[in-house]
């Protein structure tokens, strides 16, 4: 039986919010069959930005990254589904939107390395999804619910023989 309850952290970055792309980005994840279990429209402060991007602290682009991510509101989310972390990364596309394949979120909407619209937990960094979820959400902000469509997304949940 496939595990359908992997959770991952996703965020529409300030450029995506300013460009009115929250809805389109949410739609991409919903139509893939993933299930939203948390969402928060918020402004990231300096301290949270430093924690969230701690792995990039020593990179030359770090200060610019912090100033970008705190420059306007973001839409932070938690999504659930089979292989959710890697599935979201595939939908996002390559980090540099100029290299991201058409059909991906960054490939279709972006044209820049820094302004690349969406963050998703790194599936190659063990536990990054859980760490990032805990950084942005309290347990009681996450909603357990059954998505009826899941039975039509995952064959092993179906009623038919
Ligand atoms: P990811 O968002 O695809 O996981 P990371 O390597 O984790 O990519 O980098 C985090 C974010 O930092 C990227 O999404 C991008 O906005 C920004 N970034 C990464 N590399 C550079 C760079 O070389 N110059 C400027 N910004 C960068
Ligand atoms: Mg990353």
Curated annotation (Swiss-Prot):
Pfam families: NDK
GO terms for biological process, alphabetical: CTP biosynthetic process; GTP biosynthetic process; UTP biosynthetic process
Stored SMART domains: NDK
Primary localization: cytoplasm
GO annotations of cellular component type: cytoplasm
Enzyme class: transferase
GO molecular function: ATP binding; metal ion binding; nucleoside diphosphate kinase activity
Listed SUPFAM superfamilies: Nucleoside diphosphate kinase, NDK (SSF54919)
Subcellular localization(s) per the UniProt record: Cytoplasm
Cofactor(s) required, per the database record: Mg(2+)
Chemical reaction(s) catalysed: a 2'-deoxyribonucleoside 5'-diphosphate + ATP = a 2'-deoxyribonucleoside 5'-triphosphate + ADP; a ribonucleoside 5'-diphosphate + ATP = a ribonucleoside 5'-triphosphate + ADP
Keywords assigned: ATP-binding, Cytoplasm, Kinase, Magnesium, Metal-binding, Nucleotide metabolism, Nucleotide-binding, Phosphoprotein, Transferase
Protein's UniProt keywords contain Nucleotide-binding: yes
Active-site positions on this chain: 119
Binding of ATP, residues: 13, 61, 89, 95, 106, 116
Annotated EC: 2.7.4.6
Biological role: Major role in the synthesis of nucleoside triphosphates other than ATP. The ATP gamma phosphate is transferred to the NDP beta phosphate via a ping-pong mechanism, using a phosphorylated active-site intermediate.
Family under the similarity heading: Belongs to the NDK family.
Protein name: Nucleoside diphosphate kinase
